[in-house]
């Protein structure tokens, strides 16, 4: 009988510990959904989604070209075909929340095409996106991307 209670206690402790470890901020799923929507919209060149739903009018960007820019500059790049990719993969490694701010970090692999720098090559980069929850919606207020490898 003592063995039964010992096993029951261990089993309950493992269940509780697993539940605590697997507990996730409910906002994380929404940020992951929006990150994927942003990635897909860039890949498709869907300016309506990017301009109206994802990118804040106040967004600033530290670009892979090592230039600090604004949302207007990013919009101009999109319109001119300078954000034109054959493929765009994003691997989120960490999402952290601080009140109404979400910080997303990870890696991206893109394959630029057309007249872009590195067209036809595989470009690996590190990224950080900063999201702000305001007026009942999330938008990107800052982005940083750094090229780490071109093949």
Which stretches of residues belong to each language-model region?
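A short, structured loop/turn motif at beta-sheet edges
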Residues: 95-102, 118, 131-137
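A solvent-exposed, acidic/Ser-Thr-rich amphipathic alpha-helical stretch
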Residues: 26-32, 46-98, 107, 119-122
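Sequence/structural signature of outer-membrane beta-barrel proteins
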Residues: 111-115, 148-150
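A short hydrophobic beta-strand element
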Residues: 100-112, 125
């Amino acid at each position: 009988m003592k063995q039964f209670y010992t096993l029951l206690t261990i089993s309950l402790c493992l269940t509780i510990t697993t539940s605590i470890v697997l507990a996730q901020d409910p906002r994380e799923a929404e940020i992951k959904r929006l990150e994927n929507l942003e990635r897909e919209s860039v890949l498709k060149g869907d300016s309506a989604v990017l301009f109206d739903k994802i990118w804040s009018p106040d967004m600033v960007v530290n670009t892979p070209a090592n230039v600090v820019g604004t949302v207007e500059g990013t919009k101009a790049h999109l319109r001119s075909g300078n954000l034109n990719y054959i493929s765009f993969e994003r691997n989120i490694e960490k999402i952290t929340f601080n009140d109404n701010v979400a910080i997303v970090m990870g890696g991206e692999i893109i394959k630029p095409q057309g007249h872009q720098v590195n067209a036809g090559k595989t470009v690996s980069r590190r990224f950080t996106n900063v999201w702000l929850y305001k007026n009942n919606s999330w938008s990107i207020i800052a982005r940083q991307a750094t090229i780490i490898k071109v093949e």
